[in-house]
A protein has these predicted regions:
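N-terminal beta1-alpha1-beta2 module of alpha/beta enzyme domains
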Residues: 1-83, 182-183
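Internal, glycine-rich beta/alpha segment that forms the wall or movable "lid"
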Residues: 3, 99-239, 292-295
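Hydrophobic faces of well-ordered beta-strands that scaffold small-molecule active sites
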Residues: 5-11, 36-40, 89-93, 118-122, ...
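Active-site mouth loops of central-metabolism enzymes
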Residues: 8-20, 92-101, 179-190, 248-251, ...
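Short, acidic/polar
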Residues: 17-29, 103-106, 188-197, 261, ...
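Glycine-rich, proline-tolerant flexible connector loops at the mouths of alpha/beta enzymes
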Residues: 37-70, 126, 131, 209-216, ...
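Alpha-helix-loop-beta-strand connector modules within alpha/beta enzyme cores
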Residues: 57-89, 228-229, 365-384
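An alpha-helical appendage that flanks or caps ligand/catalytic pockets
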Residues: 139-175, 216-343
């Protein structure tokens, strides 16, 4: 590697867990010296149907009543910034549920709290976060354009701003003169329109592996294509960031990992999320478990799934598909797999380890140390 990659520790903050527990974990990450940022997800509900969260599938279900009681990501980010000074904050959100002026104001505030180490990744949105609450997922990309253009306009001017938009229009919009620290704004996701918006207006882009880039070579192709587009637009591609979330299972016990791949919770994730475009399974000679035009971001509403629909998907999702849907192994093995994507152009990485959902509480708590070890290995590799 030519330089050390930026590392982010994924935090899924729920309301069942005392906030002080997250503060302690954030402090441990900050003190490690190898974790640059926390990644906090702005979610309304999780990926799994409620029927799958029970003690037959995981001992954690006897302790945590549900997986959907998320904390507000922005409120928790402020709390964690105060609890662990020196750590950076990255929030992933969608373009629909907050206005561009409000989001810009919030991110300016977090940038001040972290001395410039604040980032927001904005996607076109997931139906599960949007449709049940009265928003329209179909407006996602148009609203993303408004978000990116609105942020840039508000940051660039200390005078009132007029800006036409698709859904939000500024008329003498003003957030004052303070410009202490600029937050970073990235696009989150994929597709031609989102790539166009990212290379035109954003500071970077992030995607999830292996779900959209199952090999380092496929990721390298994405990076090279986007860098060429940045150059065509007169932007410096070396100033643009490329981030990856790794959907991961991390543990020292290989047998435990193989059993985890057959657990209904992980098999479900492989079915709905293992390849975001279901048709992508065709290239690997695998029959998709859902219709080829089915995409989780547009179609997945976990609360509405019936028991028969759930069991049907689990039957159609094979062990091989689960193996191809996660980056999994020991901390050393996962770090080595992540390094390949860094060599292929990733500049920011977060190992999103969801295995603790299946573990007993003591083993689940050890997940923090495993993921910090991965960050340490990545930092060490960046110095060689």
């Amino acid at each position: 590697m030519s330089k050390a990659v930026t590392t982010a520790l994924a935090f899924s903050c729920d309301r069942h867990t005392p906030p002080t527990n997250f503060a302690a974990a954030a402090a441990a990450a900050a003190q490690s010296g190898v974790v640059d940022e926390l990644l906090i997800w702005d979610q309304m509900t999780n990926f799994w149907p409620r029927q799958l969260w029970h003690p037959d599938n995981t001992p954690m279900a006897a302790i945590v009543p549900d997986l959907d009681s998320y904390s507000d990501a922005f409120a928790m980010s402020g709390y964690l910034a105060a609890s662990a000074p020196g750590i950076g904050l990255t929030i992933s959100t969608d373009a629909i549920r907050r206005g561009p002026a409000e989001l810009t104001q919030t991110m300016m505030t977090l940038a001040n709290m972290t001395e410039g180490r604040a980032k927001v990744m904005i996607g076109a949105g997931e139906a599960k976060q949007i449709t049940p609450y009265g928003w329209r997922r179909s407006e996602g990309l148009a609203r993303l354009e408004d978000q990116l253009k609105g942020f840039n306009a508000l940051w660039a001017s200390t005078e009132p701003v007029d800006l036409p938009g698709n859904h939000w229009t500024f008329k003498q919009a003003w957030l004052g003169q303070s410009r202490t620290h600029r937050p970073h704004i990235w696009a989150l996701g994929g597709g031609p329109k989102l790539f166009y918006l990212a290379t035109t207006y954003a500071d970077g882009i992030s995607a999830i592996v292996p779900c959209v880039a199952p090999t380092p070579e496929s990721w390298a192709h994405t990076v090279s294509t986007m860098k060429a587009e940045l150059e065509r637009k007169g932007r410096d591609p070396e100033q643009f960031e490329f981030g990856i979330w790794f959907m991961s299972l991390v543990h020292e016990d290989a047998d435990l990992l193989e059993r985890a791949l057959d657990n209904p919770l992980m098999r479900w994730m492989a079915g709905v999320f293992g390849r975001l475009d279901q048709s992508a399974w065709d290239a690997e000679g695998i029959e998709p478990p859902l219709p080829r035009d089915w995409h989780y971001a547009v179609k997945l509403l976990p609360v509405t799934w019936t028991e028969s629909e759930i069991q049907g998907l689990l039957r159609r999702t094979t062990h091989e598909m689960a193996q191809k849907s996660f980056v999994y192994g020991t901390p050393e093995s996962v770090a080595a797999q992540v390094e390949q994507y860094v060599e292929a152009g990733a500049t920011w990485v977060s190992v999103c380890d969801i295995l603790p959902l299946l573990l007993d509480p003591v083993d689940a708590q050890a997940g923090l140390a495993r993921n910090i070890e991965i960050c340490a290995r990545l930092k060490k590799a960046g110095k060689t």
